[in-house]
Amino acid sequence: MWDRVEEQGVGSLRSHTHGRHVPHVSYAVLRRWEQAAVTDALAAIGGGDPVELSFDGVGLFRRGRTWLLAGVSSDFVTRQQRVVEVVTATGAELHKHYRPGIWLPHCSLAPRATLVQLPVVAAAVMDVLPLRGRLDRAALVNSATGEISPLAELP
């Protein structure tokens, strides 16, 4: 999907910042955290089965952040709530948009699309949707550097 967006001259998450992004759905974004404590807390909740998602729409956050909207099960929402609960219990500071009840499960497309580019992004992806995805692994990712620390199990 990122290729389709980039082919239309719109920067996708692939070419954003450090260029090490991979397609993903985030349970949480932490503004401050202690990695060892967060890793241990997530390990303590045990592993879950892979998650099947269906992306069937394009969404828009402020400042031109376009994304694919995922239809999710109540189990997936419960997992996100559990992840937030255990990581914030370590003292980690959660980004306000990832609070349970506010969180919108999504996969980012273009992080800085202009108003003129929004219909271009939508046209690039609408004929491909729905897009099915399987989440079968998880990691802690430092989005500033792109450093990825895989987790042993999918929370």
Predicted segments with their positions:
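Charge-rich, low-complexity N-terminal segments
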Residues: 64-65
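A short glycine-rich, hydrophobically flanked beta-strand micro-motif that places a catalytic Asp/Glu
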Residues: 53-57
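Basic, often amphipathic N-terminal segments
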Residues: 1-52, 75-134, 149-155
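Glycine-rich beta-strand-turn "strand-cap" elements at beta-sheet edges
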Residues: 58-61, 136-149
